[in-house]
């Protein structure tokens, strides 16, 4: 079915540990990113646990920032770090914050802070806030002279910088998808049916994992 970009395709859910693809479930291209995501994650986590794996830290983009998904993640992972979607109800609290700490991360200067928020009724989490002055000088209607990005977490011990740096490592995992698209045919799936294409996704992911394991053994 058509994706949000209006071409035919699929929207697989993919789990990655380190540099290895450890879980794949497929869905039609026009499904919302949160559609049955809780169920997909539950199956991923249960398979890990059946194989003796314990998840210490889980990170995901804003597509996972919903109450039922976060509840499921908390059952299986000690800590989570999820990009929080924009919430206008929090703007007043964020704008009133004092004590911003200036940090340089990857050569870019940011200001960091954190607050406790009741994201969902009766559930408080830590919101780590990262802001950067707009380079174009244009004032945003809601955010003013800064661009704000937030990370929702249940980690109350790590510093704001440590949390931002850990979450930013997620960007490196996007290169895995570049690798799969360019080297293993994920950009153009071979069949017309989801079941066959899911098999293709699984087999090519296994091949890549074997390749990475061999390269690691050879220490190349």
Pin down the residues of each PLM region.
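A short, flexible helix-boundary coil/loop motif
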Residues: 210-220
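Domain-level cores of phosphate- or acyl-group-handling catalytic modules
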Residues: 31-91
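Short acidic, glycine/serine/threonine-rich loops at helix termini
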Residues: 1-2, 22-26, 67-73, 91-97
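Short amphipathic alpha-helical "interface-anchor" segments enriched in bulky aromatics
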Residues: 160-194, 199, 203, 207-211
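An anionic, glycine-rich sequence signature occurring as long contiguous blocks
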Residues: 79-182
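Electropositive, glycine- and tryptophan-enriched low-complexity nucleic-acid-binding patches
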Residues: 2-51
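Short, conserved catalytic/metal-binding motifs centered on acidic residues
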Residues: 1, 19, 55-65, 80, ...
